[in-house]
Amino acid sequence: MIEPEFKDGLLPVIVQDYETLEVLMFAYMNREAFDLTCSTGIAHYFSRSRGKLWKKGETSGHYQHVKEMRIDCDRDCLLILVEQDTGACHTGYRSCFYRTIEGDVVGEKTFEPADVYKN
Amino acid sequence: MIEPEFKDGLLPVIVQDYETLEVLMFAYMNREAFDLTCSTGIAHYFSRSRGKLWKKGETSGHYQHVKEMRIDCDRDCLLILVEQDTGACHTGYRSCFYRTIEGDVVGEKTFEPADVYKN
């Protein structure tokens, strides 16, 4: 296996749908998240804002099933191809990149956040 | 236009082929690189290792012509869809993500670095 380089303990990760090739989201893994992703096949990340490990889908149930992992030429960025349950974005869109920079909505809404995130 | 958020002066950027949807590379823009990309339609980045602005293709001639820019839900990551001249990676592959984490080569080689990078 090619060993990724964690800069300041973190590895940037691009998440892409393995069938449609839509880019779904961008996040970071620390060593623990990377190891858990490899061992379980479910994407785990490190939340910089919350300062802790984050199993994607632990609240929403929208897990990411990892089909393939690729690493870039410098070994400091990861591309993972996943099967995404329902949607990746907390706003209800399948992809976090659902808007152009001009503000046009180009993504597909796949769930209602109010139905999923209940306190 | 939706204003991106530059954390510590930098914005992570995912670069995707606008036709094949192949993820080509990952880089960072500072404010100057972002503005130049918007005004010229040619991708510019900020090289963290060299500490300076970097017009992609300035040495190789392999420019990236920006077709669309998308921003994520948090406005702190950019996805740009480009027409890539020849190849994006300095190793000669079209994409920097030409290997799986297991080390299998899955990308296409599109040029010989020795022919392109001459001192």
Curated annotation (Swiss-Prot), chains A, B:
Pathway in which this enzyme or protein is active: Amino-acid biosynthesis; L-histidine biosynthesis; L-histidine from 5-phospho-alpha-D-ribose 1-diphosphate: step 3/9
Residues that coordinate or bind Mg(2+): 72, 74, 76
InterPro entries the UniProt entry points to: PRA-CH, PRib_AMP_CycHydrolase_dom, PRib_AMP_CycHydrolase_sf
Subcellular location as annotated: Cytoplasm
Keywords: Amino-acid biosynthesis, Cytoplasm, Histidine biosynthesis, Hydrolase, Magnesium, Metal-binding, Zinc
Chemical reaction(s) catalysed: 1-(5-phospho-beta-D-ribosyl)-5'-AMP + H2O = 1-(5-phospho-beta-D-ribosyl)-5-[(5-phospho-beta-D-ribosylamino)methylideneamino]imidazole-4-carboxamide
GO cellular component annotations of the record: cytoplasm
GO biological process: L-histidine biosynthetic process
Membership in a protein family: Belongs to the PRA-CH family.
Protein name, UniProt field: Phosphoribosyl-AMP cyclohydrolase
Species of provenance: Methanocella arvoryzae (strain DSM 22066 / NBRC 105507 / MRE50)
UniProt gene name: hisI
